[in-house]
Swiss-Prot record:
Biological process (GO), any one: fatty acid metabolic process
Family matches, as Pfam families: AMP-binding, AMP-binding_C
The protein's name in its UniProt record: 2-succinylbenzoate--CoA ligase
Record's catalysed reaction(s): 2-succinylbenzoate + ATP + CoA = 2-succinylbenzoyl-CoA + AMP + diphosphate
InterPro entries named in the record: AMP-bd_C, AMP-bd_C_sf, AMP-binding_CS, AMP-dep_synth/lig_dom, ANL_N_sf, MenE
GO molecular function, one term: o-succinylbenzoate-CoA ligase activity
The protein's enzyme class: ligase
Gene assigned in the entry: menE
EC number: 6.2.1.26
Family according to the record: Belongs to the ATP-dependent AMP-binding enzyme family. MenE subfamily.
Pathway membership, UniProt: Quinol/quinone metabolism; 1,4-dihydroxy-2-naphthoate biosynthesis; 1,4-dihydroxy-2-naphthoate from chorismate: step 5/7; Quinol/quinone metabolism; menaquinone biosynthesis
Keyword annotations of the record: ATP-binding, Ligase, Menaquinone biosynthesis, Nucleotide-binding
Length: 487
């Protein structure tokens, strides 16, 4: 049985050295140049930071070439990369640094080194890049069962857990994605999502495994992304709903080169899908988690309207099962989504309790609720922890949010349960509005689309909704926004 592979970047630089690997701010870099830059960073990390095989290096960088070098440099040294969210607070990062037992924190301007020096050795990436590199003998192979990256769950509930993503997980994810989406020599994958998020990071590994350029953006800007798609002939883009909405608002026709918009972060509402179809945007809806190293389920565009709201079918070599009380559910029966496949993490770092709760007979319990139809298409209903039980009836916030998003005045919607003396809990809606609207109008609008018990008892206007790094709505924080009730 295969247990190791040649280091992906080393082999890619040998196979296609002059092929474009990375495009950033209109500057191009070949795979030969990417390997050279990554090897130099590895040499500096070894020489000045004493990073070595078996260590963990935490990376706190924005989307930039040095972030790409840093990840590959860790692998060239045989070290694990701990990806830190740039949006977290100091206390949240300190917890992850301590929990991961990182030896080094690699950071950039904008973060205060002094805040972390009591917990871990620190290095500024720009200062490090200015030092003489020297030379190293890189680790020529990767062991598939070894942890490549440690990425913390977004913490929609409870404290974050370190997800151990192996080289085998990342490789299987890349291969399964290629079998699903196809790969051509023309492909260029645009990433404007953060590289500390699995949807962004996974594209770096696809790049070296496929021999495909990544067009990297520091952050998402509608104008910049549309310009980049045109000038670099981008064929694939990873996106979340807010990004897709922004692109649709600015163009009447999908850019000609674009063949795939891989959409994550939750089911797309009907009005958005209808606009995508009208403008011929090739949206592939997907379902995935940090624990599955990106998408594990994908819906092709030809099914997007016939299977409205579905996340699709599992990628090749992956499986889905819906369970209730440990037993498989029949088609259309609601239960917990469980998954199995070579891209599923090997476990949470030093969290035996969480691993025992999450795995059962090889199946990973996602904590999400859903069902399979009679053709095996997955429909994701909601997080189990977000379910609202009102007078004995189950209310899925995502269903209520989808109804509200169909209203022309509603740009974003979040729904959570609020304590009620009669019903136990009732839904409250938190809305980002584009124009004024009354609660009476919204109630009437919902009445045409939802059962009476699902209609929000109150509506609140907010400036923005709380989201994690994966752009997933953090419904447990919505009640903190309880002001500005619509009359």
């Amino acid at each position: 049985m295969l247990t190791e592979q040649p280091n992906w970047l080393i082999q890619r630089a040998q196979l296609t050295p002059e092929r474009i690997a990375l495009i950033f701010e209109n500057k191009q870099m070949t795979f030969r140049e990417l390997y050279h830059a990554s090897k130099q960073m590895a040499a500096r990390l070894s020489k000045y930071c004493s990073l070595k095989k078996g260590d963990r290096a935490a990376i706190l960088l924005s989307n930039r070439p040095e972030m790409v070098y840093a990840v590959h440099a860790c692998f060239l040294l045989g070290a694990e990369a701990v990806l830190l969210n740039t949006k977290l607070s100091k206390q949240e990062r300190l917890f992850q640094l301590e929990d991961s037992q990182a030896k080094l924190l690699l950071m950039e301007d904008g973060f205060c080194r002094e805040e972390y020096e009591s917990a871990v050795a620190t290095a500024d990436v720009d200062e490090l890049q200015a030092e003489e590199a020297g030379d190293i003998e890189p680790e020529a192979y990767v062991t598939l069962d070894d942890t490549a990256t440690l990425m913390y769950t977004s913490g929609t509930t409870g404290r974050p857990k370190g997800v151990q993503q192996t080289f085998g997980n990342h490789y299987s994810s890349a291969v399964s994605s290629a079998l699903n989406l196809g790969v051509t020599e023309r492909d260029r994958w645009l990433i404007a999502l953060p590289l500390f998020h699995i949807s962004g990071l996974s594209a770096l590994f696809k790049s070296v495994i496929y021999g495909m350029p990544v067009v990297l953006h520091q952050k998402f800007s509608v104008t910049d992304v549309l310009d980049s798609i045109s000038s670099h002939q981008v064929t694939i883009i990873s996106a979340v709903q807010t990004m897709l909405s922004g692109l649709l608002a600015e163009t009447e026709q999908c850019p000609e080169s674009l063949r795939c918009i891989l959409l994550g972060g939750g089911p797309a509402p009907l009005p958005l899908l209808e606009e995508c179809r009208r403008k011929q945007f090739p949206v592939f809806q997907s379902y995935g988690l940090t624990e599955t190293c990106s998408q594990i389920v994908t819906l092709s565009p030809e099914f997007s309207m016939d299977k409205l709201g579905s996340a699709g079918k599992p990628l090749f070599s992956c499986e889905i099962r819906i369970e209730k009380d440990g037993n498989p559910c029949a088609p259309f029966e609601h239960g917990e989504i469980t998954v199995k496949g070579p891209n599923v993490m090997k476990g949470y770092y030093h969290r035996d309790d969480a691993n025992q709760a999450a795995f059962h007979n090889g199946w990973f319990k996602t904590g999400d609720l859903g069902y399979l139809d009679d053709e095996g298409f997955l429909y994701v209903l909601d997080r189990r922890s977000d379910l609202i039980i009102s007078g004995g009836e189950n209310i899925y916030p995502a269903e209520v949010e989808a109804a509200l998003l169909a209203h022309p005045a509603v740009a974003e919607a979040g729904v959570s349960g609020s304590e009620d003396p009669k019903w136990g809990k009732v839904p409250h809606a938190f809305l980002v509005l584009t124009s004024s609207v009354s609660s009476e109008e919204l109630t009437a609008f919902c009445r045409e689309r939802l059962a009476k018990y699902k209609i929000p008892a109150a509506f609140f206007e907010v400036d923005g909704l709380p989201r994690n790094a994966s752009n997933k709505l953090m419904r447990h924080r919505l009640n903190e926004l309880r002001k500005g009730e619509l009359s």
